[in-house]
Amino acid sequence: MKNVTFPANENVLKSLQLAIQSYSNYLSSYIDALNKYISHQRRVSTLRFERATLIKYVKKLRFFNEELMSMDMVQQYRGGNLIKTAVCSLASFFIRCLEVMDLLNYYLTQSLKNETISKTLNRDLVVSEDCVVFLESTYRHYVKFTQWMLEALDIHDATLTVEVLQFARKCAKEDGLDLEETDDILLQEVGVVSSASEYQELLDEWCLVLSEQYMGLTKAFEAETTRWSEIFEGRK
């Protein structure tokens, strides 16, 4: 086992701050898109309950986002703290966000979709399959990043796990999958770093990957909101 007890130097803390910004961008993309969808839902009286549920989700995402924006990793953890201490605290909050995002994605792609189609008889008022692909891909990348944050420092804690990751591993084990050959990002193994500089370098690379995911998701949401606007306006 490698010695991964590194001090939290300022460079690493600044990179963790970039990770916080990446999560904030992720949440903001949902907040912006859902606010527009909620506004359109006002035109359909039969969707009052669904609209109220989405408003509840948006409020939760806003709360998380405000908490993220108030975090200052350099100020909080410089001066003798270990990287593990900062990462465990941050990952714990990220996991809270991910659990809500998992429920929200399910609501958008299953419950809300089914209720909207049932009440309006219109399949165009829901999240499109093209957008769902981006929802799932982006979520899985943020899950994997959070797992990497921890396991790259050889942190294995039952309280710092994401349900979807545990489920994927359980299914893979039951199916006898070779994890070294899988293309599933959730099942790919994480290597332990040997230095703080290596951790920072990989952390920065991950932030670039998350940025690409966020931009793809944002474009998908923009296409959806444009489509929703045209459809809902046509129902006036």
Curated annotation (Swiss-Prot):
It comes from the Eukaryota. Coiled coil: none annotated. The keyword Glycoprotein does not apply. InterPro entries: RNA-bd_She2, She2_dom_sf. One of its GO terms (cellular component) is nucleus. GO terms for molecular function: RNA binding. Keywords: Cytoplasm, mRNA transport, Nucleus, RNA-binding, Transport. One of its GO terms (biological process) is mRNA transport. It is found in: Cytoplasm; Nucleus. Homodimer and homotetramer. Belongs to the SHE2 family. RNA-binding protein that binds specific mRNAs including the ASH1 mRNA, coding for a repressor of the HO endonuclease. Part of the mRNA localization machinery that restricts accumulation of certain proteins to the bud and in the daughter cell. This is SWI5-dependent HO expression protein 2. It comes from Lachancea thermotolerans (strain ATCC 56472 / CBS 6340 / NRRL Y-8284). The gene is SHE2.
